[in-house]
């Protein structure tokens, strides 16, 4: 079955609010680096050959290019987007994860998963960034995100002429991390904190913690966390308020992210907010059938 997706203006605006923060970055090809393939057992009489030349080529990895903008330029771009979207201007750049942490506030049911997938494609088109990690708070949301990637694949192929390679992190299938590192296209790792939270703590006692932070014989005596962080991934947090707050934020620094995008209808912690589609906006645009008001608080308004 082929799904047809209508591009909504508010979704385009949400994408542009993020992409425009990096205006001035320019287009850069993925930064190539020498990928650690780990220890491999080679024949004792191994000599230089065409085969070994091919193996050297296979050692190449592709990571996200660094942000060329200064903190002052990033903050200026953020404030421009806040002005456009009638949001209270940020006084400082928030750098909880990487160079900046941006908040995108979207009411539940308005297609935020579609929005951040489209944002990946636009960031790749405009700036060349291609390595992403989507972090979700539950298995149910993880499966929903995976399904959205599946059903929108043809849609984005039609618009961008390429597909995103996506996979769910599985500590028993670490070879996926090698493909994530060596492929130059758009690559997305989806991971849920319910299955991974204990391993976010480097001194965790769980099986997952021992795997991600320890050198694995079956993984060429490498630590999976080192393979992941070498790519300088862009972190996308789906419903971050459900992920354990500061503990998760601190642990995610182990991924050495380029920057972070937070998508939620109710942000528990404020970063640099660049787009808002609240319940009233969603209702006025007929995106939801009704809203229930139990009290109100005025926030994010300029003036």
Where are these regions (language model features)?
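RecA-like P-loop NTPase motor core of helicase/translocase proteins
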Residues: 1-303
């Amino acid at each position: 079955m082929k799904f047809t997706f209508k591009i909504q203006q508010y979704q385009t605006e949400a994408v542009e609010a993020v992409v425009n923060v990096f205006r001035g970055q320019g287009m850069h090809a993925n930064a190539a680096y020498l990928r650690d393939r780990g220890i491999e057992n080679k024949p004792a009489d191994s000599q230089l050959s065409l085969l070994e030349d091919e193996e050297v080529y296979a050692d190449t990895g592709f990571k996200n290019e660094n942000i060329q903008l200064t903190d002052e330029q990033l903050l200026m771009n953020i404030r421009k987007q806040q002005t456009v979207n009638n949001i209270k201007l940020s006084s400082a750049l928030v750098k909880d994860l990487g160079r900046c942490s941006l908040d995108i506030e979207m009411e539940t049911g308005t297609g935020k998963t579609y929005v951040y997938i489209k944002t990946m494609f636009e960031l790749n088109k405009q700036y060349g960034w291609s390595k992403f990690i989507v972090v979700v708070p539950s298995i149910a949301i993880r499966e929903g995100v995976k399904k959205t990637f599946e059903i929108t694949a043809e849609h984005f192929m039609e618009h961008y002429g390429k597909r995103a390679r996506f996979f769910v992190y599985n500590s028993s299938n670490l070879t996926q991390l090698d493909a994530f590192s060596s492929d130059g296209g758009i690559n997305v790792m989806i991971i849920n904190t319910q299955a991974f939270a204990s391993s976010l703590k480097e001194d965790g006692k769980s099986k997952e913690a021992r795997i991600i932070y320890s050198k694995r014989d079956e993984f060429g005596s490498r630590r999976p966390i080192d393979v992941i962080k070498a790519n300088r991934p862009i972190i996308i947090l789906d419903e971050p308020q459900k992920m354990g707050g500061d503990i998760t934020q601190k642990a995610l620094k182990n991924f050495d992210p380029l920057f972070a995008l937070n998508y939620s209808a109710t942000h528990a912690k404020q970063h640099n907010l660049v787009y808002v589609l609240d319940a009233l906006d969603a209702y006025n645009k007929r995106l939801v059938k009704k809203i229930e008001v139990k009290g109100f608080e005025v926030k994010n308004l300029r003036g």
